Regions:
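N-terminal secretory signal peptides that target proteins for export/translocation
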Residues: 1-15
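Intrinsic disorder/low-complexity signature
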Residues: 2-3, 18-19, 50
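Intrinsically disordered, low-complexity regions
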Residues: 9-10, 23, 35, 165
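Sec-dependent N-terminal signal peptides
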Residues: 16-26
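C-terminal motif of bacterial Sec signal peptides marking the signal peptidase cleavage site
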Residues: 29-32
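Patatin-like phospholipase
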Residues: 34-114, 129-393
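Active-site loop->helix "elbow" adjoining a glycine-rich segment at hydrolase catalytic centers
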Residues: 91, 119-120
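Hydrolases whose catalytic domains are alpha/beta-hydrolase-1, hotdog thioesterase
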Residues: 124-127
């Protein structure tokens, strides 16, 4: 049998020169088969299209304050809105899953009026919202080894494809496995009590931070609502390039088209309050907020001699950007709580956790981080009440 390697060796010099060009052309042709076909639409149509023919299923972080009031939970605990904000962090979501289980087992897990999630935090959010009875599901998601499949994408062509056979759809299948009609019904029941479940995505077309009211989507209760619920979770955790963007069908003035959504962490590493609130100097109206920020990441700078290959440089650059954005949001949120006499609680991966992942979504690493989060959640000092000293360096 003649292998491609042997065939290339037998080519004349000039033809060997053009062999790589032919390979690149083939790759480009194959990747083009996985390019999303888009329906054109205008900026005016993009302003506030409807999803599922239902109004107010999502909002935007830069909306006027009055329109965001609908996201305020009616449910309070001891007169306060208890609000859990879950950050992004990829495989480091194992920390948040373990931390919540530790709180549960220590008997000191708050009852949350509202839960928000971004990226890996979005995958945690529905289970955190529904309470300790779902802790085992989270443990399975982050420690059973199933998440390691996310790093086993469709090979080199997957990074060139946004749809089709080469695109990496493993995240979509993972979400479909864990989010079913029963979970949707449970979320809808809690939403009816006045609680709120919010998930953030980034709309690539408008470059806006989208805040999805997942409880309201759940209350629609149709098969299409379940599909949308899954799509939003998948989009929020869809790291650009690694996973394809998620197309969400919308409608404006009778015109149907699709928006492209990716990782919510592209525009917001963690959602405490929309930027409209964070940037205002006046007091936030309504019930006082008891804010809990659960950061699935380190917040202190870690020295590392970065390797010179493209992947190492890209990963280090992305992680640095996320870390800086996360620290900024922590400080903005802390100052908002100070201005309004709200309570502030923070948990994050500390510098005392020293294990390093040997590969993306390493099961052994995620198990170690889950155990670390669990012990931290059980400890008397699970939460700190001001930004970490490391973040000031």
């Amino acid at each position: 049998m003649v292998t491609p390697h042997h065939a290339c060796r037998r080519l004349p010099a000039k033809r060997r020169l053009f062999a790589p060009i032919g390979l690149i052309s083939c790759l480009a042709l194959l990747a083009s088969c996985g390019t999303l076909a888009r329906t054109p639409y205008t900026a005016a149509e993009a302003a506030r299209p409807e999803v599922l023919d239902v109004a107010a299923l999502r909002y935007f972080a830069d909306d006027p304050i009055q329109s965001l009031d609908a996201l305020r939970p009616r449910a309070t605990v001891n007169g306060e809105i208890t609000y859990l904000a879950l950050s992004g962090g990829g495989a480091d979501g194992a920390f948040g899953a373990g931390f919540l289980a530790g709180l549960s087992d220590a008997g000191k897990r708050p009852e949350f009026s509202a839960v928000s999630g971004v990226s890996t935090g979005a995958l945690i959010a529905p289970f955190a919202f529904l309470g300790p009875q779902y802790d085992q599901k989270l443990k399975e998601l982050y420690t059973s080894g199933i998440a390691s499949s996310l790093a086993q994408g469709g090979g080199p062509l997957s990074i060139l494809s946004t749809s089709g056979p080469f695109a990496n759809h493993r995240l979509e299948r993972l979400v479909d496995r864990y989010v079913d009609a029963q979970l949707l019904q449970a979320v809808a029941a809690e939403n009816a009590k006045g609680r709120r479940l919010l998930v953030v995505t980034t709309n690539l077309d408008t470059q806006r931070t989208n805040i999805w009211d997942m409880g309201r989507i759940a209350q629609v209760g149709t098969p299409d609502a379940l599909t949308l619920f899954r799509k939003v979770l998948t989009a929020s955790a869809s790291i650009p390039v690694v996973f394809p963007p998620v197309a969400i069908e919308v409608e404006a003035a009778g015109h149907h088209f699709e928006e492209l959504h990716v990782d919510g962490g592209v525009t917001s590493p963690v959602l405490t309050l929309p930027e409209t609130f964070l940037l205002r100097e006046r007091r936030v109206p309504g019930s006082p907020i008891n804010m809990y920020m659960l950061i699935n990441n380190e917040v202190d700078r870690r020295f590392e001699v970065v390797q010179g290959d493209t992947k190492s440089l890209a990963v280090r650059s992305a992680s640095t950007l996320v870390k800086v954005q996360t620290r900024s949001t922590i400080f903005d949120s802390y100052h908002l709580t100070r201005r309004n006499n709200f309570k502030f609680n923070l948990a994050y991966v500390g510098s005392d956790f020293r294990e390093q992942a040997t590969q993306d979504f390493s099961t052994s690493f995620m198990r170690a981080l889950y155990r670390y989060g669990y012990e931290k959640g059980r400890s008397p000092s699970a939460w700190v009440h001001q930004p970490p000293p490391e973040a000031l360096h």
